[in-house]
Swiss-Prot record:
Name of the featured protein: Defective chorion protein, FC177 isoform
Bias-annotated ranges (Acidic residues): 1119-1130, 1295-1306
The keyword Signal is annotated on this UniProt entry: yes
Location of the region described as Disordered in the Swiss-Prot/TrEMBL record: 23-60, 184-212, 268-294, 843-875, 944-983, 1119-1221, 1261-1352, 1375-1515, 1538-1590
Bias kind Low complexity: ranges: 268-280, 1151-1195, 1307-1319, 1435-1452, 1505-1515
Lineage per the UniProt record: Eukaryota, Metazoa, Ecdysozoa, Arthropoda, Hexapoda
The organism of origin for this protein: Drosophila melanogaster
Region spans: 12 X 26 AA approximate tandem repeats, Glu, Met-rich: 493-788
Length: 1590
């Protein structure tokens, strides 16, 4: 059906489809546009966009409710919207009438439909109960303003007949008026009529009959619709009057009949399909409640006759353009690129939408063609099988070019059941596949696919209106243009006469056009060669920036400027000039050839002019596809050449051409001569002048000669004088021109000799240009054709046109035109190349990654699943993809609490934090173990863990170095100097493990060398030798003996983001967790569990070290503590203090720098190991603490080694149980065996100690009495300090404290030793805790006689799982009485010590309140134990006093953070419960791992105080009794205060009191702090011998 017939259908469709909206005034623009192509002389009034859009129903993705229509619209959203909103397509009629229930009900209240059987109607329109008819929409679609003239809409004669039949024509307006319930006889737009009736309805069939009635209906309906919709906006009569003739479509009859015909039974939903008139009544009357002052119906009746007439007239026109292509709106888009110059931004936007819409429509038409073709095949196959199909259907689409497809074609195609079926199937498939995906994409993905319905109805209407307007403008412009073009063709045909005429006309036009073109880019759209020439000239002038006249006028100024420019150009030779010049020459030659080819150009009668025009024409042709005439020109080149010759031979042309050419020749010669002279004078200027003259000669000469012949003559003189001036002027006018000219001049410089010769040749050639023009015309015809065919050539020409360079280059091109055609070709080739280079489009910078996201780039090229992020893929190559310096801190998955920067506490293993363990330093890529190791070493954060320490470096110096150099940058620090805490820890480890246990590299996990720097990344020193030689060099497994050196899957220090095997992950956790300072417990989490969970690796390592290294009970820790309180304990304190010192702060740093976990881990672990082994003797405090926190208990066990070992074992077991880490379990079992060994050793040591104590008791009691006294004050002093620290720690992570306390309790056996351990753990408070333990140890030494007894019961309790650190005399009493101690076994000590107090509170309270004797006894026993241990260790020479190690072990926990402190606090906390008095502190010391540590110290001969402690312990034992009484009182007071104070405060008080109680421990703690801060090697030295003993 013709578009007009379609239009009514579309209107109906619109009414139905858009029926939901009151009025789907389909784009008036669209209809008009489609009509527009049909030439409508009267420019219809285009309703304002508001008017149009106001009537448009909101275009939701077209949902009609009609499954077929919906399927069609889904499949062809653009096409459907075009047909629907553009009113170009009776979608419903094609696809079948809309079921009544689906009929959109518009404002039903406004329209009263009187349905009656229409006797006249051939087919009764099925009454659509939801009346909103497509007709209503058709009526709406008169909303298509008058503008829309559907030129090609031929409603089939059926439509006319239908309309005639439709007695309810008034109903049409009613329908229109009521976008609503109008049942519109055409529920299925006419297009939809079943194929059988289709013939009548076929658009081609009845365009004429349609026209008259549709005109009437359309106009009346449209009027009514308009008046109804926008009575004010649309003058229905005017709109309809103008537009109706354009589209007669509103043939309700036609639509209805089409529907009936084509879809008699199309959709059951359409009860009254063509065949079935279940709803037999047609619309006999539509009564619209007049919204408008006048009745639409009346007006419709009034206008009906007039409109009928108009529509008849329209129909005649429609016949001419019987079928308006659906893409009628495509013409204006491609029309004049020049038009864009005058287009407003809004127009450009609309045009962009229009083009996008056009592309969409084209794509959908192609798809529809494919579907139709497939349907054709299906039908043919079905017919072959079943015989002939019931009716034959022609498949127009597949045979019709897309741009010629009309609505009728689509209707006819959709008439086919197969096509509809295929469309439905495809739509269903898409709905299934893409529908869900689209929803997902829209909902879930940023790359949400835009819905198929990209354009809203408003957009489409706007687009169509714009297209229609453009079409009208185009038609108008094309009329004149066609006349001009025809004139041009006639000129070509009659070159002599036409050339003469056109030449005069063209010069006038050119001048006018130049002005107009300058003023009116629309003139460009006219695409008149004259205009184009004018525009080209204008462009030349504009390029020159000086209008032709200005150039003429400003010769003097321009000369000066040009001379200057030339000088500048001369100064600035540009090699490009040569290329461009050649290119320009090629272009100019091409242009000349085209000009030669184009009689129009010949008419200019100057090759220069012709060349300029041809260039212009070519450019415009390039710009204006309309100018495809270029090919015609090229084809006509031969004719044109002849014409040119003829024209040139023309007397007028001969005169004009001859005069101009003679003048040009003279000018050119003069210019050339001048240029030669200038060139001789200024070789640069000469070629430039020549080139410019050539360019100007064609351009300027054309302009000047055309405009001012006299001026041309003067210019000949001027040209002789001023050719350079012209060029200079142009150059001055156009810096680009200048540059181009510079290039050309440089080219000319280079080619100057050639050009000089060429200039002569050019003289000759210009003389010969006619021949050349002919020859070149042919050659360049081919070239032009090539160029036309070659988009680059077209682009080049456009580019040349766009760029003044091209125009300027035309000058050189002019010269080249005189040059051989071969040179031209070469130049053109160069031109193409240059254009490719110059005009080339930007391509993807990474073409190989063109379609992929950057994160998918395989930076290493290792391959793998490209769709997966390499981080997530565990590919065989171990790749740490630090892809590039990430602009933002990459998220690091925290594998441990401290790993990953921010991950403390419960979220330790949780969601990766934005905090980058790599310090936001960006990712670097390393492949392979060596590269990874080296990179990690260089990586400061990782280097902390990996960097080998120079064994010679003392902890203090190294720590200072590393402190100075925090790992803040990813730039590989030479050794990635570790942070202070790491360095301290590393030094501590090094001193403890490195020196003392460095030789012991037998640990299963680590070499036991205690070197954090171990090449294997472990805290083993075995690789130190190699590391010393090559610190940063990638470690080779050869250097390191430990397994870790060969990292199969992942080494702890590799902070890779890739998946890590469990073992490696555990190692990572151990290494990085060792750096933890504090563990944040979940509210309901048991501290012990948390400790085990977080510290399993650390515990394991500590146990390993304990097994590997001697237990150091020694007084180094005490000495460190004592150093703070300069007393005897200073001697004892020196070793452990170093480590505890940095434990807290350094651990904090460690925690902060999370990346340094290994170092801190090593230190912490090392203390743990050393303490476990040696600490029993020397550093029981630290060991115990460490054991408590991790498995330091085992280390402490050497003091109360059995008990501590059991505790540590229990802790280890619980930790491995908690973590369920098989590795840890194995290690724990190993640790258990080690603990057993340690227990045995400790028993032996105890025996020795008992022996030694018996010897030393007499001596030491006296000695120790004084220290205890001093201890008490110092304890009291320290209590506040401890309390403060404890408070801080408690406040910080109470949970950690609890964990510490738990560990302490669990280490109750090593309570004595563990007290130092807590201080060690505490690295913040290490001095205090250690100090108090040391005091205890001293008193313990004095008590060593009691120690045997106490040691026995303490050991028994420790074996039972009590934390010996917290054992007090009251506990001893309870134990003696066979009572269960009221202290928790391996209690989780809340930061508040609540759990610890759970058992301890009574026991602690008991200590002061129950029996001072118990305290004294316990203190004595602890001291005795310490003495015995120290004596045994010293005697046995087994320097199990790993005071250093012990400190180290606490250190890891200190690294753990407040955790360690809390342990110290926890141990002290029990005392607070006992009392705040120094006695309570003393009670706290009863955890006298510390005291035993002193004995350990005495045991560890390397530690001076070990022996001293023994002596002192013996002496102080007597004093301890007195002190115990005092402490009892203090404890009572403290308990009272504790009751008053909060648990945190109580704990802090207890801690502080505990320290006061063990005055020396306080000093020791202080000294330990100092030493930790100082990281004195002395402590390390002392520890090392002790460790050696172990």
């Amino acid at each position: 059906m013709r578009l007009f017939s379609l239009l009514p259908l579309l209107a109906l469709l619109v009414v139905q489809a858009a029926g939901q909206s009151e009025v789907t005034s389909d784009d008036p623009a669209t209809d008009a546009g489609s009509t527009t192509n049909s030439t409508t002389d009267t420019k219809p009034r285009i309703p304002s966009q508001d008017e149009i859009l106001g009537q448009m129903p909101s275009i939701n993705p077209i949902r009609t409710g009609n499954p077929q229509m919906d399927a069609f619209y889904m499949m062809f959203p653009a096409l459907g919207s075009l047909l629907k909103w553009g009113s170009l397509f009776p979608a419903y009629s094609i696809l079948g009438a809309i079921p009544d229930n689906l009929q959109p009900t518009a404002a039903a209240s406004k329209v009263v439909l009187v349905l009656a059987d229409d006797a006249t109607a051939k087919t009764r329109v099925a009454r659509q109960n939801p009346p909103p008819n497509p007709l209503g929409q058709l009526m709406n679609w008169p909303a298509l303003p008058q503008d829309f003239q559907l030129p090609s809409m031929d409603l089939g004669p059926q439509v006319g007949s239908f309309l005639a039949q439709l007695p309810a024509m008034p109903t049409v307006p009613g329908l229109l008026g009521a976008a609503a319930p109008v049942p519109a006889p055409a529920p299925a737009p006419a297009a939809a009529p079943p194929p059988a009736p289709a013939p009548a309805a076929d658009p081609p069939a009845a365009p004429v009959p349609d026209a008259p009635q549709p005109a009437i209906l359309g106009q009346a309906a449209l009027q009514n619709a308009f008046t109804f919709f926008n009575p004010a906006n649309f003058d229905a009569s005017s709109l309809l009057g103008q537009s109706v003739p354009t589209f007669a479509p509103p043939n309700l009859d036609f639509v209805a009949q089409m529907q009936r015909q084509f879809f008699p039974g199309m959709t059951p939903a359409q009860p009254a399909a063509a065949g079935t008139d279940a709803q037999a009544s047609d619309i006999s009357e539509v009564r619209v409640r007049p919204e408008d002052p006048y009745s639409q119906e009346a007006q419709m009746k009034i206008k009906s006759a007039l409109e009928m007439e108009q529509e008849r007239q329209q129909q005649a026109q429609v016949k001419d353009q019987e079928q308006v292509p659906l893409l009628w709106f495509r013409m204006p888009t491609t029309q004049n690129q020049d038009a864009t110059e005058e287009k407003t931004l809004e127009d450009l936007r609309v045009e962009a939408k229009l083009r996008a819409f056009e592309r969409q429509v084209i794509a959908e038409l192609r798809m529809l063609q494919k579907i139709e073709l497939m349907a054709k095949q299906m039908r043919s196959s079905a017919a072959a099988q079943n015989g002939d199909s019931p009716y034959r259907i022609s498949y127009p689409l597949s045979r019709t070019p897309i741009h010629k497809i009309t609505r009728a074609d689509i209707e006819q195609a959709l008439r086919d059941d197969y096509v509809r079926r295929l469309v439905n199937k495809e739509a269903q498939r898409r709905a299934r596949n893409s529908g869900i995906n689209t929803q997902k994409a829209n909902a879930l993905k940023r790359q949400a696919k835009s819905q198929d319905q990209t354009l809203s109805k408003e957009d489409i209407v706007q687009i169509m209106a714009y297209a229609y307007r453009m079409a009208n403008e185009q038609m108008e412009s094309e009329k004149g243009k066609q006349d001009k073009v025809y004139a041009a063709y006639r000129t070509e045909q009659n070159p002599m006469m036409m050339q003469q005429r056109q030449w005069s006309e063209e010069q006038a036009k050119i001048q006018q056009n130049q002005q107009q073109i300058q003023q009116n880019p629309m003139m460009m759209q006219q695409r008149q060669w004259s205009e184009e020439q004018a525009k080209i000239q204008q462009n030349q002038q504009q390029i020159q920036q000086n209008p032709m006249m200005m150039q003429q006028r400003q010769w003097s100024e321009e000369q000066a400027k040009i001379q200057q420019n030339q000088q500048q150009i001369q100064q600035n030779p540009m090699m490009m000039q040569q290329r461009q010049w050649s290119e320009e020459q090629a272009k100019i030659q091409q242009n000349q050839q085209q000009i030669q080819q184009n009689p129009m150009m010949v008419q200019q009668r100057q090759w220069s002019e012709e060349q300029a025009k041809i260039q212009q024409n070519q450019q415009q042709i390039q710009q204006n596809p309309m100018m495809m005439q270029q090919r015609q020109w090229s084809e006509e080149q031969a004719k044109i050449q002849h014409d040119q010759q003829m024209a040139q031979q023309m007397a007028q042309q001969g005169l004009m051409m001859t005069e101009q050419r003679q003048r040009q020749w003279s000018e050119d010669q003069a210019k050339i001569q001048q240029a030669q002279q200038m060139a001789q004078q200024t070789p640069m200027m000469m070629p430039q002048m020549q080139q410019r003259q050539w360019t100007e000669d064609p351009q300027m000469v054309q302009q000047m000669q055309q405009r001012q012949w006299a001026e041309d003559q003067t210019r000949m003189q001027m040209a002789q004088q001023n050719p350079m001036m012209q060029q200079q002027r142009q150059m001055a006018e156009n810096p680009q021109m200048m540059q181009q000219r510079q290039w050309s001049e440089e080219q000319t410089k280079i080619e100057q000799a050639q050009q000089m010769a060429q200039q002569n040749q050019m003289m000759m050639q210009q003389m010969q240009q006619r021949q050349w023009s002919e020859d070149q015309a042919q050659i360049q015809q081919q070239q032009r054709q090539m160029m036309q065919q070659t988009p680059m050539m077209m682009k080049e020409r456009q580019w040349a046109e766009e760029n003044p360079q091209s125009v300027q280059q035309q000058g050189p091109m002019m010269m080249q035109q005189q040059m051989p055609s071969m040179m031209q070709r070469e130049v053109e080739d160069e031109d193409n190349k240059a254009e490719d280079d110059l005009v080339g489009e930007a391509g993807p910078q990474m073409p190989e990654n063109e379609g992929t996201a950057r994160h998918k780039v395989d930076a290493l090229g290792v391959g793998g699943n490209k769709r997966k992020k390499s981080k997530s893929k565990s590919a065989p190559p171990t790749v740490i993809n630090y892809y590039y310096a990430a602009p933002q801190r990459p998220v690091v998955q925290s594998y441990g609490t401290s790993y990953g920067g921010g991950g403390y506490g419960s979220n330790a293993y949780g969601v990766p934090r934005p905090v980058n363990s790599y310090q936001s330093q960006g990712y670097r890529a390393a492949v392979g173990n060596d590269e990874v190791d080296e990179m990690l070493r260089q990586h400061q954060t990782m280097a902390r863990t990996i960097n080998p320490k120079q064994p010679g470096e003392v902890g203090g110096s190294e720590s200072q170095k590393s402190n100075s150099n925090p790992p803040t940058t990813l730039t590989p620090a030479p050794q990635e100097q570790p942070q202070e805490h790491r360095v301290h820890k590393r030094l501590a480890h090094f001193h403890r493990f490195g020196r003392e246990a460095g030789l012991n590299a037998t640990t299963s996990k680590g070499c036991g060398c205690g070197r954090l720097d171990c090449l294997c990344g472990r805290s083993c020193r075995c690789g130190r030798r190699g590391l010393e030689s090559r610190v940063v060099s990638s470690r080779t497994s050869g250097t390191c003996q430990c397994k870790a050196s060969h990292r199969n899957k992942r080494s702890v220090e590799y902070g890779t983001l890739e998946t890590i095997d469990e073992g490696s992950l555990n190692e990572l956790r151990r290494e990085y967790k060792l750096g933890l300072k504090e563990i944040t417990l979940s509210p309901d989490e048991d501290p012990a569990e948390a400790l085990m969970r977080y510290n399993a690796a650390s515990i394991r390592e500590a146990l390993e070290r304990a097994s590997m290294e001697p237990l150091e009970i020694g007084g180094d820790q005490y000495e460190e503590d004592a150093q703070q309180e300069p007393m005897e304990e200073e001697q004892l304190q020196h070793d452990p203090n170093t480590e505890p010192q940095y434990n807290h702060k350094d651990f904090v740093r460690l925690t902060t720098s999370t990346a340094s976990p290994i170092t801190s881990t090593t230190e912490a672990a090392t203390p743990t190991g050393s303490d476990s082994t040696s600490e029993a003797t020397v550093t029981p405090e630290v060991t115990t603490t460490t054991s408590t926190s991790t498995t330091t208990t085992t280390e402490s066990t050497k003091d109360e080694g059995l008990d501590m070992q059991q505790d540590s074992q229990a802790e280890a077991e619980s930790s491995h149980v908690t973590k369920s880490i098989s590795k840890q379990e194995a290690e724990i079992h190993q640790l258990h065996s080690i603990v057993e060994e340690l227990k045995n050793e400790i028993l032996k040591l105890n025996l020795r100690c008992s022996t030694i104590i018996s010897n030393n008791v007499a001596k030491e009691p006296v000695t120790e009495k004084n220290p205890p006294v001093v201890e008490e004050p110092s304890k009291q002093e320290d209590k506040p300090k401890v309390e403060e620290k404890v408070i801080a720690e408690e406040q910080a992570p109470v949970e950690q404290e609890e964990e510490l306390e738990e560990d302490e309790d669990s280490t109750s056996i090593s309570t004595t030793t563990e007290t130092p351990s807590p201080s060690g753990s505490y690295s913040t408070k290490p001095g205090l805790s250690l100090g108090s333990p040391r005091v205890d140890e001293q008193s313990g030494s004095s008590n060593k006689l009691d120690y045997d007894d106490d040691n026995n019961w303490q050991r028994i309790l420790a074996n039972r799982g009590y934390d010996t650190d917290y054992l007090t005399k009251s506990h001893e009493r309870q134990f003696a009485q066979g009572q269960n101690l009221e202290m928790p076994k391996n209690c989780n000590y809340d930061g508040n010590g609540s759990q610890e107090y759970g058992p301890y509170p009574e026991f602690q309270a008991d200590e002061p309140s129950t029996d001072t004797e118990g305290k004294a006894k316990r203190a004595l026993s602890v001291k005795q134990q310490a003495q015995l241990l120290n004596a045994a260790l010293n005697d046995s020479g087994s320097d199990s006093s790993d005071g250093t190690t012990t400190t180290t072990t606490p250190s890891p926990y200190a690294m753990r953070g407040k955790f360690v402190r809390r342990r110290s606090t926890a141990r002290r906390v029990p005392i607070p419960k006992i009392g705040k008095a120094s006695d309570e502190v003393w009670v706290r010391s009863p955890r006298q791992a510390k005291m035993p540590q002193r004995p350990k110290k005495s045991m560890s001969k390397p530690k001076k105080q070990s022996s001293q402690v023994t002596t002192q312990a013996t002496v102080s034992s007597t004093k301890l009794d007195s002190l115990v009484d005092v402490l009892k009182d203090l404890v009572r007071l403290q308990i009272q205060k504790e009751k008053k104070s909060s648990l945190l405060r109580t704990q802090s008080n207890n801690l502080s009191k505990t320290k006061p109680k063990s005055i020396k421990p306080v000093k020791v703690i202080k000294r330990k702090r100092l030493r930790r801060r100082q990281h004195k090697s002395i402590a390390t030295t002392i520890r090392s011998p002790i460790q050696t003993k172990a």
